[in-house]
Amino acid sequence: IILLDNGTRATLPLSNMGGGMNAVGIGILYLVLGNMVAVFSDALVKVLEPDQPVFQFVFFRQLSAAILLAPWLLWSWRRNPPVALKWHLLRAHIWAVGVCLMVIALTRLPLATANALFYAAPLMMVPLAVWLAGEAISRQKVLTAFIGFVGVLIVLRPTEVNWAALAALGVALSMALNNLLIKRIPLQQPIAQTLFFTNVLSMPFIMALAWWEGGDWQWQMWWPAFGSSALIMVYAGLCVVAYRKAEASKIASAEYTGLLMAVAIGVWLFDEQPGLPLLLGCLCIILPLIAMARSKPKPQVEPAL
């Protein structure tokens, strides 16, 4: 749960790719690399101490994202003037709350546990899509969502639920809501603009929370925040390239290698020891997601980067 915000993508299938690796293989490779980058972004958040100011870090992260995305925004501004700003504003504030909860979760939970709970986002989208969008769902989706939520309970171990675990579920909820709200954004809107507005429009809100939080500004957090934002931008770019190379239904399951990488990086960098409940819960979460990813989506037009 992760975590990141590249919206609904369409598929532009390529009939032939020269060389030894086909389009599906290249797409999977990009997704695997992208998810590895995203886990390292989470690791940069995890190096923070739990008592460091959360809202300051989130503000630094938003500011660095705005700096990184500004050239793309200026380049696309004339061709694609910003639209649907009220929906961008709503998504930005939901995402800001989610990022604050993400910092709380990552600084207090093992990396793999936090990521396993973040992956509940696609599962949460199933009931939310029925409730908010009035979508009809199949029995298969109900069953896969149920199995996935069983996995979440196994990871959580209800007797050990704490605020950090609830924060991780809050991250998943914010991601699910934002994924549903992306449908309110015109498909022709460049992804860079969407990412820019998602970070910038909630900066006054986060700045006010940082002022309320009090204390001196800890500028040493700037570089972890900048690094985390930069890695997420790389992840978003790799995802766009991957989904342009091959059909989403054929490669989307590669996204879930991120959870395996979170386990590996947690062991390597933070001396975490994943137990059997975590591994079993991860399986219950990932397998339904793979089943959902393999169902054929309706073709859509992809926005330009």
Cite the ranges covered by each PLM segment.
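Juxtamembrane helix-loop boundary signature in multi-pass membrane transporters
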Residues: 2-30, 123-173, 187, 286-305
